[in-house]
Every structure is written in C-alpha cells, then in structure tokens.
Amino acid sequence: MSIDVEPTGRPRVLVVGGKPKLVRKARELGLDVVHAQYPDAYDRVHWPHVDQALLLDYGDMDRFLPLARALHEVYPFQSAVALFELGLLPAARINEELGLNGESVETVELLLDKWRMRQRLAEKGISPMASAIGRSAQDVRDFVKAHGLPIIVKPVRESGSVGVFRVDDEAGVEAVAGRYRSLDDEQWAVGDLFSADSFDEFLMEEYLDGPEISVETLSFDGRHVVCAITDKAAFGGGSGFVELGLSQPSRHPEETLDEVRRLVADFLDAVGLRNGPGHTEIRLTSRGPRIIESHNRIGGYGVNEMVETAYGVDMERYTLGVRFGLVEPLASAPEPLGGVALQALTPEPGRVVEVNGVDAVRADPAFVDLHVKVKPGDVVNPLTWNEDIGGYVIARGADATEAIAHSKRLAAAIHVRTEPVA
C-alpha cells in the first residue's frame, strides 16, 4: 500500500463505525483520524474531519484486518476506537493484532455474548439468574418446567431490543421458538445485526421484576466512575421492550442507587473492563438489583447528550481524549446540574406524508436535541425494536420530573402524518 501523507506530529486514531459526530470530536481534540465505515454511511459530512478512510464492511475481519495492518505500516495509528455496537469487536481485534492500546478481545466478547457473560457472573457469584441456551421449542418447555413462567427469550448477541420476547403462558411457550425463527426471514440491512446466524440459537432467562435503569460509566485504569444513572420510564412496541422514555438523574432512593453502584463496579471488574465507557442495564428487582446486560460503549439514542446536559460530561470526548492523554480522567462522579429527559417519537405505521412542528420545538427554551428519523415518503414500521422509532426529542428541566414533562410536551408537538401503505 502506498499513500502519500505528510507527518503532522499529532496522535492518530482509527475510528471504527459510528456517527459523524465521533470523527468530528476526534478532530476537535487535535487527533488525526482514520475512519473505517460502511460505504453507504460515509459522505461529505465526514470529509473535513477524516484524513484516511477505509470503506468496507468492517465486520468482515478477513478483509478489514489485512487492510488495517497495511495502512498502519505506512500511516500508523495509536489505537482503534469504536462506540457503535458492531464496531466494538473489530476495534478490539485490530488493537490486539497490532499491539495497540485498547480493551481486550476477551472483555469485548464477554460483553457481546450474553451467555458467556452469564457464565462469568455465575462463576463470580454476581447477580444470580437462571439462564440457558435454547434452539428449539422443547428447550423452552424444559426451561419453563425447571424455572416457571414468565421467562425472557432473546438473542445471545444483538442489541436494541431486537428479538426480545416475554413468554407468559403455555401458548407463548409453544409459539416463541417459531417467532424467533421467523426473524431469519426479515430483510435486515448491513449494520442491523451482529451476524447472519444471530437467530440460530437464543438465550432463555428468568423474568426479572421491577423497574429498569441503566448505569453510564467511564473507567480509568480499572477505576470506575458512574457518570449518570438513567431511569427508563416507558416501554412499548409489540415485544414491550422498545425504550420510549429516559430521564436523568435517577429518581430512585439513594440507598438503592448506592447498591447499584457497588454492583456495577463488581460487574465491570468481573468482565475485565478497565478503560473507556460502559452502559450497563439493570433491573431493580424485589431481590435486589440484577444485571440484564452491558456494553463497552455509550448508551444508544441520545444518552451521551443526556449525560452532557444533566452532568456536564461528554462521554464521547472522554473516550477519545483520555486514551491519548488529551483529556484528564474524571476524579470523581459528577454532580447533577439539572434534569434531562428523552421521549421517543412514535408515529402511526404507514407511509410518511408530512412532518411538522420541528422549528417550534427547536425554538423552545427546554429544547436540547431533536432527531427525526423519518421524512415524507419513508415507511414507518410497527414498533418491534428500538430502530423502529421515528426519532426522539431531548428536553431539560430543573429536575428530572420537570424535564420529563417538557420532553412529552415537545414530542407531542412533532406531528408525523402517515397514510396506509397500499
């Protein structure tokens, strides 16, 4: 590989996947940027912030790794970074293969593979939960016979609430394996799924009662700092697991949150996460907090913008900057500056005719951010996973309660009119 480049003396990062704002923030920190991205996800908005681009399916490591190695030889980068689910393992593989700084492949694999994560927690005696791998309706029957109803059936790998089902009765027991297999027939886009065989087997777990929260962390050489605890206020969709409302700071009792903080620190130690972001989902059950799953990335939707609004911490900037010595690690958990809430936009399924109210929402004093995913001509699908929402609005308030009210008000002001698809 021959590339004519002028040395800049700046540290250089390989950013694997993710949104344009990540390469922009890398550039703002003073980094040279190499960007690996799907060809159809790379356009002129990236150009001012990217020095070299590798446009390919970066999940195909047989192609990606040789190209990254060859580029590294003539245009060396100090670390590969990913904050998008499907980029986490490729980034870790490249760092390991090239001897660069980053989280271990073992840690990333533990967090991506929910069954391996459960086994590790069982070994450590952390967050006990009945679970097993299934491949057939008989496996579901056997698990229910051993542990009772309700249960949760979900992919071993995947995120965004795709393929998550709650089974409440015998009819559900008989149907869930078939529903799961039918996911193979869906038309998934590149970047939707971790792998083509994601639905060959599933994870069965006992159902956890109680409200759900997520814990947003940054780790610095094994020291875990809780940046925020996010309340998940509303769920919806056919599965009942599509996240529709989020808020910070958490409104749960401080005694409960202290227990959560201790659990998350023990969990991150158990999986070996030493540096960078974490997004750990937890149920506050009648038996105490229990781990649902975790990721070595920042939470999806607008969680980074929420943490920055409520606590003044840009987790993306810390993820990039601390690794290269451009940002000082957080000394302690930040104190809240106010409240913030996110409300999903859930237009009626059908073809989008018009979208109104955007300008008025952006001008509102409570406005923080708005992401409308649909435009006239697009088709809105029924809610089955997080990617089916029509977008979201984020609002601020004096506290979480006020922010929730503002977010609902602003979401209601966005009018997405649809018509039936012929």
Question: Residues of each region from the PLM?
Answer:
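ATP-dependent carboxylate/phosphate-activation module, predominantly the ATP-grasp catalytic core
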Residues: 171, 199, 206-273, 277, ...
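A conserved helix-loop-beta module that forms one wall/lid of the active-site cleft
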Residues: 97-163, 178, 182-191
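ATP-binding N-terminal substructure of ATP-dependent carboxylate-amine bond-forming enzymes
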Residues: 1-107, 112, 138, 325, ...
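Conserved ATP-binding module of the ATP-grasp superfamily
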Residues: 128-129, 150-153, 170-209, 244, ...
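A common structural junction motif
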Residues: 182-185, 362-366, 410-420
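A structural supersecondary motif
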Residues: 278, 361-379
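Flexible, glycine/charged-enriched surface loops at secondary-structure junctions
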Residues: 189-192, 275-280, 330-334, 417-422
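A glycine-rich beta-turn/hairpin centered on an aromatic-Pro dipeptide
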Residues: 327-366
